[in-house]
C-alpha cells in the first residue's frame, strides 16, 4: 500500500455557522481524494465500467480531532488495504501544517456489474494500489 496525498484549501461553502468546516464536508473531501488517487493509478470510474466491475461504498466514517477553518491548507493522506476477498478499506488522515486534525475510513465492496453481486478483487486491481 502506498500513500497518496491530496491537497485542498477549505472553501467558503465548507464552513458552518460555527465558523469551522462542517463535519459532513469531510465526506466530500474523502470522495475527492479517493477519486484523485484512483485516477492516478488508472482505476477511473470509466475504466471500472469498461471492465464491468465497480467499487461501491458499504460504510463511511470520519472523526474530527481539531477543526479546520476557512482557507486552511489541508493535506489528505490516503491509502487502501484489502480487507477480504471482495472488500477493501480506504484510510484517510487529514493534516494541517503536519498536525493530524481528522481521520476517516471508507469500506468498499467490489461488485460485478453482470451479477450485481460482490466479486473477489482481481490481483491486478490490488496491484494498482500497492
Predicted regions and their residues:
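Hot-dog-fold acyl-thioester-processing enzymes
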Residues: 1-58, 112-130
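Residue-level recognition of specific faces of alpha-helices
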Residues: 26-29, 91, 107
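Hydrophobic beta-strand-centered segment that forms part of the acyl-chain substrate-binding groove
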Residues: 37-88, 101-102, 109
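Core beta-strand residues in small-molecule sensory/regulatory alpha/beta domains
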Residues: 93-95
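A structural microfeature
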Residues: 102-104, 120
Amino acid at each position: 500500500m502506498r500513500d497518496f496525498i491530496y491537497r485542498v484549501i477549505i472553501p467558503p461553502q465548507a464552513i458552518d455557522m460555527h465558523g469551522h468546516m462542517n463535519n459532513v464536508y469531510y465526506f466530500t473531501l474523502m470522495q475527492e481524494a479517493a477519486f484523485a488517487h484512483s485516477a492516478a493509478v488508472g482505476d477511473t470510474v470509466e475504466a471500472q465500467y469498461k471492465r464491468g466491475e465497480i467499487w461501491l461504498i458499504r460504510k463511511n466514517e470520519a472523526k474530527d480531532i481539531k477543526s479546520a477553518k476557512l482557507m486552511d491548507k489541508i493535506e489528505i493522506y490516503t491509502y487502501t488495504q484489502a480487507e477480504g476477498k471482495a472488500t477493501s478499506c480506504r484510510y484517510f488522515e487529514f493534516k494541517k501544517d503536519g498536525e493530524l486534525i481528522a481521520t476517516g475510513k471508507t469500506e468498499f465492496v467490489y461488485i460485478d456489474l453482470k451479477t450485481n453481486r460482490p466479486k473477489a478483487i482481481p490481483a491486478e486491481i490490488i496491484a494498482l494500489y500497492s
